[in-house]
Swiss-Prot record:
Taxonomic classification: Bacteria, Pseudomonadati, Pseudomonadota, Gammaproteobacteria, Enterobacterales
Functional summary from the UniProt entry: Negatively regulates its own expression and that of the subsequent genes in the proximal part of the division and cell wall (dcw) gene cluster. Acts by binding directly to DNA. May also regulate the expression of genes outside the dcw cluster.
A cellular component annotation (GO) from this entry: nucleoid
Stretches assigned to the SpoVT-AbrB domain: 5-52, 81-124
Organism: Yersinia pestis
Protein name (record): Transcriptional regulator MraZ
Keyword Cytoplasm: yes
């Protein structure tokens, strides 16, 4: 399980160093093999250990290619999916097209989200957090049943 937000730097080749606290579990779970793709709703990337990505692929394979909305999701997620292998120094090369899509420059936020990471441009991440907090504080909508049962 991945949690927490960590600022990491992209080097001139587009590689990021995976924080040490995640390296061992990633090597055990996926031998350092990862898959990166776009997020359909946010200006960030999604980074999955290969076994977790294979579960997503199975779910995507059950969608109908004849349904335009389902085909669109398949096209976007699978079409942007890029495999990356953690090297001996614990670095991952993020494809240039993906970096461009998410507006990633030097400073990047690696955000743990249970079974995957999100990759955000640092400034975009902080703005998103601010926007999310503002939205929660100003919302007039009742909490969903699931959120009502969540005790923090």
């Amino acid at each position: 399980m991945f949690r927490g937000a960590t600022m990491v730097n992209l080097d001139s080749k587009g590689r990021l160093a995976v924080p040490t606290r995640y390296r061992e579990s990633l090597n055990e779970e996926s031998q350092g093999q990862m898959v990166c793709t776009i997020d359909l709703h946010q200006p960030c990337l999604l980074l999955y250990p290969l076994p977790e990505w294979e579960i997503i692929e199975q779910k995507l394979s059950r969608l109908s290619s004849m349904n335009p909305a389902e085909r669109r999701v398949q096209r976007l997620l699978l079409g942007h999916a890029s495999e990356c292998q953690m090297d001996g120094a614990g670095r991952l090369l993020i494809a240039g097209t993906l970096r461009q899509h998410a507006g990633l420059n030097k400073e990047v936020m690696l955000v743990g989200q249970f079974n995957k990471f999100e990759l955000w441009d640092e400034q975009t991440w902080y703005q998103q957090v601010k926007d999310d907090i503002d939205a929660e504080q100003s919302t007039q909508e009742p909490l969903s049943e699931r959120l009502q049962g969540l005790s923090l």
